[in-house]
UniProtKB/Swiss-Prot annotation:
The active site is at 45, 117. InterPro entries: dsRBD_dom, RNase_III, RNase_III_dom, RNase_III_sf. The lineage of its organism: Bacteria, Pseudomonadati, Pseudomonadota, Gammaproteobacteria, Enterobacterales. Its main location: cytoplasm. This is Ribonuclease 3. Keywords: Cytoplasm, Endonuclease, Hydrolase, Magnesium, Metal-binding, mRNA processing, Nuclease, RNA-binding, rRNA processing, rRNA-binding, tRNA processing. Its EC number is 3.1.26.3. It catalyses: Endonucleolytic cleavage to 5'-phosphomonoester. Digests double-stranded RNA. Involved in the processing of primary rRNA transcript to yield the immediate precursors to the large and small rRNAs (23S and 16S). Processes some mRNAs, and tRNAs when they are encoded in the rRNA operon. Processes pre-crRNA and tracrRNA of type II CRISPR loci if present in the organism. Homodimer. Belongs to the ribonuclease III family. Mg(2+) binds at residues 41, 114, 117. It comes from Buchnera aphidicola subsp. Cinara cedri (strain Cc). NCBIfam families: RNaseIII.
Length: 226
């Protein structure tokens, strides 16, 4: 990759690499090379979770564990990381195989999110935990300002579970109905079975998790909880 292009990306990120190979590795999807970024992604995921958890602990001293867990989940989830990647115009720097390029992989949420995690790991390996912490907190500065500790709403699955438990009902059972599309661009249909309801509640989403959340939301509406 052109050194001028790499210099521009490093400016967006806010960090200049000593070993630029680490950054190139972080940008390489498995479709492009056997030397891909998945191991870096694994490491970066853990580093990000730790740093965000630490920041929440210090920013919100009166918040309980459940509240901090929900806020962390919001801050480290795929669409948040993809938003950060978009702010860096990261898609145009990714190294993708021809198939992924043709299918629009450079703008796919999961690929962008994974690349951000890989970049986090590459910064850590190129420097130290204190440097990568400073960089991450810089990326998240405005997001922390917008976080409302009293307004962090639980996700639909959690709300449904808590409602059913409060009524002493059995927990919902989620099962996969159908999966449409190619492996890199699938749509999931999930069925949610709740004791006392004759019909199955249906959820649809771009991942199993999202489809389950959609099914749980529909269940809450059907139960007239929301």
């Amino acid at each position: 990759m052109n050194p001028i292009v790499m210099k521009k990306l490093q400016k967006f990120i806010g960090y200049t690499f000593t070993n630029i190979t680490l950054l190139k590795h972080a940008l390489t999807h498995r479709s492009a090379s056997s030397q891909h970024n998945e191991r870096l992604e694994f490491l970066g995921d853990s580093i990000l979770s730790f740093i965000i958890a630490k920041a929440l602990y210090h920013h919100f001293p009166k918040m309980n564990e459940g509240g901090m867990s929900r806020m962390r989940a919001t801050l480290v989830r795929g669409n948040t990381l993809a938003e950060i990647a978009t702010e860096f115009s990261l898609g145009k720097y990714l190294q993708l195989g021809q198939g992924e390029k043709k299918s629009g992989g450079f703008k796919r949420e999961s690929i962008l999110a994974n690349a951000i995690e890989a970049i986090i790991a590459s910064i850590f390996l190129d420097s130290n935990i204190y440097t990568v912490e400073r960089i991450i907190l810089y990326w998240y500065k405005n997001r922390f300002k917008k976080m409302n500790p009293t307004g962090t709403k639980k996700d639909p699955k959690t709300r449904l579970q808590e409602y059913l438990q409060s009524k002493h009902f059995s927990l919902p059972i989620y099962s996969i109905g159908q999966i449409y599309g190619e492996a890199h661009n699938q749509i999931f249909t999930i069925y949610c079975k709740i004791d006392g309801l004759s019909e199955l509640l249906i959820g649809i989403g771009a991942s199993r998790r999202k489809a389950e959340q959609d099914a749980a939301q529909n269940a809450l509406i059907r139960l007239e909880v929301e």
